[in-house]
């Protein structure tokens, strides 16, 4: 059995980054003014942010079926008979199902793991899978490990403007309804408990209270300094740094990394969003 490990740009990394690690990465598509472009390879992160500032209507979609098929056919010609895939989660995209369909059409074995999220967690899982396979760990043990990562990770979103998420259908009906209430700041989360959909964790009146509610939630989960903490933002660096400092001041020993939020996600959360990702497995998901 020869296995090819496959992901997509929902990880927040350019395909070339994954190529160096021996992992195949397909680009998600971003559409603006009727034209679809491959994320990172045909439209840059800064270009996406600029279009958001210009109030352009942006949409995202899974990698083109043609590109998935071309990739898998090339892998089959190179002697691979199995695809091991960790793409963006099913709750946000049909990528996983499309990959499985095309692998089946090409009579290749398919192992797909739902990350129930995207970005850091997704990248962590595909890289962990590749490393474990190279260490001769059985596939069923690899799957169990990835499932444990998905079970234990927590991702919480604070959005200034929910219009983008409502337009894209990335919110559950309850979350969308709350977004329309005057002065309400829903605290949103995504993970296995929400089946990979963005849902409401709580609702508060101000962004400060929203941040305080997130920190309270982490303490309720017994999150401590042994966890990985990452704050990802959509063109809101100052706000993200302040949020990170608040977390570090209230969770003893916590060290928070600040990064840009994946463009294909930022399109739906809108400018000003700050996302907090935590994981109890820093060696796997840092």
Regions found by a protein language model. Give the residues of each.
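Short glycine-rich or small-residue beta-strand-to-loop segments that form or flank ligand, phosphate
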Residues: 82-89, 111-114, 128, 228-233
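A short, acidic, amphipathic alpha-helical segment used as a generic capping/interface helix at domain edges
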Residues: 69-75, 206-222
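N-terminal glycine-rich anion-binding loop in soluble enzyme alpha/beta folds
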Residues: 4-67
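Gly/Ser/Thr-rich loops at beta-strand to alpha-helix junctions
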Residues: 11, 88-95, 117-120, 236-238, ...
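Short, conserved loop-to-beta-strand elements that form functional interface hotspots
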Residues: 252-268
